Each structure stands twice: as structure tokens, then as C-alpha cells.
Amino acid sequence: ADLCAKGELDGNVNDFMTLMDDHMDEIVVHPAITERLEKACASTDIAGYNYMTARYEMDGELYPNRVIVGSETYPPEIARNWDLVEKLPHVIGDFTWTGWDYIGEAGVGVPAYQWGEGGFGAGFPCQLAYSGDIDITGFRRPASYFREVVFGLRKDPYITVQNPHKFGQHLIKTPWVISDSVSTWNWSGCEGNPAIVEIYSPGEEVELFVNGASQGKKAAGKNAGFRTLFEVVYEPGTVEAVAYENGQEIGRMELQSAEREVHLELEIEEGRAKELSYIHVWLKDSQGRVMTDCDKKLTAEVTGDADLAGFGSGNPKPEHSYNEGITETFHGHALLILRKSEGTESCQVKIKSEDGLSVEASF
């Protein structure tokens, strides 16, 4: 009520549900929910539970023959959910919301520092849900690596960094947001300032190094929910994480800061549908490192026997239509989709930035 009075919320049901998330475990085990589930589950071979992790153990005791799958679960809770999947024989799996990002439910996974910037109430130009493990261009986001570690499929730790420009500010999160972290060590303007390094790691411990200097070891793996935080001072260079099991190294990962001078680089991916080609556009330095914090507005020009089917990025708040031929890179990346005509003999693609960078390719 206080937030509504201040104009920070408009009182809609989605805002209410976000605020109520801290009480969701209590709500879903209420007897009224139990009664309704009895009717629904009586006619199903497998009961799909949306956001009802708190019922897994309880319902295993109440209904020994009920088989449960997490049909929709929160990304930040994958460690908790997967532990129960492995422990409880009647819980057979977990489906997060969601795998691939999408247009619609705008803002549900967008981290924010002011009401209205993210969440269900995110304003224009927010278009994407931004809750996918994979962004709308097919680029893996940190949550996908978190999940890979939890599933036991990755031995190397994975480094992300919470936005140091916002250090100390309160992050407004919906239940679909883990943090605002990005896997990069490019934070221009934050030199000498504190930063939170967020590491997803297997093993018993993880050690962090900044420019070769150890920042200490902390608990990792299952006992830490596979997510470990270090507060460090940001300085350009390198940040490296090393995971240990029984005192022995089992994996490591390093991020390097990119040089400020960059060029445009194309990476061409042929689609399974022969008429489509996917052209990734990167901002890279002379060493091939992606520059994530100097995004540029790009214009695409297609000539020959092909059409531009789409041009955009993983940014949940694009300012241009995907078929407009104009976009801005997001963390140093954009994607152009080319539709070739039947019998295409040749076509050309040229990408230009507002500050004079250009790159082109022929097909």
C-alpha cells in the first residue's frame, strides 16, 4: 500500500504476486491448495507443479503414488529444485521458466533499480521477457551456466560480475531474476570502485584472483548453492576463478578486459532452413576479446537476391523494430537474419556503426 501511495506500484495483480513471492512456500502448502490438487491430480499420470517446490516432500508423504514434475520453476531456485529431484524418487525432473527468451510478458526477468524499470510493470520500450537461459539471439546467458554447474555437467567455474555502476543500490527482482550480473571484466568508469563477482562453481571451494592477486577462498558447490560472491576492487586486467575438490584443482575460468579500440566482426551461421542465414555481429578488440561496455548503434544494408528478415540484439528494451535494419549492440553483440530467395546467386551484407566502423560480407 505504501508503494502504491508513492506511485512506485500501480497495484496490478502481477506487482502483487512479485511482492508476495517471499510467502509463496507458505501459500502453496495451504489446505485449500491441497484440496484442489486432489481433484486435478486424480486424472493425471504425472502431476505438473508450477512454482510449488515446497510441496514436493509433503506430497510424497501424503500421496505415495503421485509422480511429480516441476513443470515451471524459478531460475534462481535451480539448486534447491535439482537437489529435490535427485533426492526424491517421485519427483522426476524440472522445467525452468524459461529456456529461450521471447517477446511478451515484457520485463518479467528484467532487473531494476526503480519501480517500472523491470518486472511485469516495465514500461516502453521493454518488449522481451528476459527470463531465458538463452537470449532471443541464441546467446547463452549466465543462468544457463549456473544450471550447467548445478546439473554436474560443468567442472570449470563460471564468472559473472554484478553491475558495479549500481554497487550498493537495492536491486528490485522478480522471482525470475538471479541478479544483474554479466560475464565480463569491462566496466569503464568503475576503476578503483567496489564490485561483486558472482561465481557459479562446482567443488568444495573456489578461489578468486584479480590481476594475479588472490582474493581468498570461499565455499562453493552444493553447500553454497553453487553460487559464491566476492567483493573486490575493480581494476582492468584479468579476473580468474579456480575450483577445488579435496584440495585439488578441478577447473578454472578467466575473464580479460578488452581494449577500448574495437572493430566490427561477422560470424556467419547457416540455418537448418536453407533459406536463412544468421549473421552474428560482434564488437571485438585486436585480440578478439568482446567489448561489452561501449555498445554502438548499427545500420544493416542487404543487396542482391536476399532480404533482411530481422536485425536485433538480446536487449529486452530495443528502440527499433526487428525488421527496421537498425539496432544497437547489447553487451557487444547483435544478430542479423538473412532470408535468401530460391535460386539465390549472390547477395551482400554491409553493417555500419554511427561512429564510422563498417564490415561487409558476400554470399
What would you call each of these model-derived segments?
Residues A1-K274, S286-Q287:
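Substrate-binding clefts and catalytic carboxylate motifs of secreted carbohydrate-active enzymes
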Residues N12-M17, G312-I326:
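Acidic/polar low-complexity surface segments
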Residues E205-A213, D295-A309:
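Extended low-complexity, serine/threonine- and proline-enriched intrinsically disordered segments
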Residues K218, H263, E301-K317:
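Short aromatic-acidic-glycine turn motif
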Residues T228-Y234, N323-E342:
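Short, hydrophobic beta-strand segments
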Residues E235-V239, S277, G343-C347:
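Exposed beta-strand face motif in extracellular beta-rich ectodomains
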Residues A243, L283, I351-S353:
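Conserved structural position at the C-terminal beta-strand
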Residues N246-G251, S353-E360:
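Short, exposed coil/turn segments at beta-strand boundaries within extracellular/luminal domains
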